[in-house]
Amino acid sequence: MLSRRNWLLAASLAAAAPMTGLSRLQPAARPGRTEPGFRIKDIRRTTVALPYRPVPARNMARELPHWVYSEICEVELANGTVGFGETMLYYTWGATSDEDVNFANGKNAAAIMWNDELGAGLQMACFDAVARAIDVPIHALLGKQAHTRTPVAWWDIDLPPEDVAGYTAFKTKGRPWFDIWEQAKQGNAAAPKGFSITFDYNDTLLDAERGIPILKAVEQYPISKMVETPIPQGDILGNQRIRRETKSAVAMHYGNPSPVVAIRQRVCDGFVVGGGANRVMTAGRIAGMADMPFWLQLVGSSITGAWSRQFGAVLSHASWPAVTCFQLYAAQPTKQNVEVRNGFTPIPNAPGLGVELDWKVINQYKVPKPPARPEPERLLETRWPDGRKLYIGSNGNVNYMLRKFMKPSNLPYFEPGVTCHLLMNDGSKDWRDLYQRARRRPVLTR
């Protein structure tokens, strides 16, 4: 027989499982629902290319050089209030299209702001405008405040060991083309007490049989307290085995497998939650009902960092450090940066997002919107101590290197001593020939 608590949980999970169309079912925000002053009078969009800081720059260049591009969206209401938001153009749960702008123009911002189909920047700007118009922080529109500060983590893509040393807390990648044992060792040697590194494997451990020995080796270091997606999330039995046989908490992206399966089958310890406002609030409440922690993963500059804090204010189980990636950038488009102390950032109570745009910075880094995702030619060389070399070239796909290691293949698995770097284009015929071969298929030599 189901207990009352389990029955309520099951019923809520069943109701939340079909995420498609939830934005249309979500009640519109009440403040100003019929007030003409909340009508959207104008929508303006500005593209910027924010420069990376030095360490992220040399590592993001391998697979994610396009993360520098963001679009700032401003929404002006009939009452004169202006709100703003941000879309990271080439890494987002939803980009704001011209069709979305045409749909929103003339509409009541309070009536449409829960519609995740607006895309990141436009939805964020609608919330910001409505909250500013009624002089409250966005979190007052989301629910009752549960926290006055929220945890936040540094994030960067896969790094060689020497770039790990010296950081205080961050989430990074575990990859077959870097020495995971040395990454953990050097990170641990530089870490102060209480420091932790979360390695996101993005499926690359492939299965529990091969992955568990690596996870056990890494978790011997005190800095290793959590892992993300060590093997494919749909491998229920494999993930259950990892949880049984290792100590580190396992985080999975919410929605795969379905929340019903993930919670009932205990395939993870908590979630990674992202997406639009409606999806984030739904996922956060389901996780709270299941008493499972999660981190918010809403990625962008300091604008998105401020947006993430609003959800961290009201979601009780957003207790794992949030990933927003504002730390990657040498310049921020807001006058106020995200202040982080001892792993936490305070939640502002100023109206809207609680930050203001810095037009000096925006105008400095303003660029024409690219017609498509920029795709510079990149050739990666991976080396092993025994002399093997692997060459993989960019081929128009995001994560062109990662994709080749996410499924079983004849490519090398995790090994000690491996390292990877960009092989710069020296203009030679040899480089061009190798690149053309490596972009078609991996080239492994001895």
Residue ranges of each PLM-predicted region?
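Shared catalytic-loop signature of beta/alpha-barrel
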Residues: 104-110, 223, 234-249, 255-357, ...
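C-terminal extensions of enzymes
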Residues: 335-446
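C-terminal segment of N-terminal export signals and the immediately downstream linker at the start
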Residues: 21-59
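N-terminal export signals
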Residues: 4-27
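Short Gly/Pro-enriched turn/cap motifs at secondary-structure boundaries
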Residues: 61-66, 114
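Conserved, mostly hydrophobic/aromatic
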Residues: 80, 135, 227, 308, ...
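Metal- or metallocofactor-binding catalytic centers and their adjacent structured scaffolds
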Residues: 36-47, 75-134, 386
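Metal-dependent enolase-superfamily TIM-barrel catalytic cores that perform enediolate-based chemistry
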Residues: 140-246
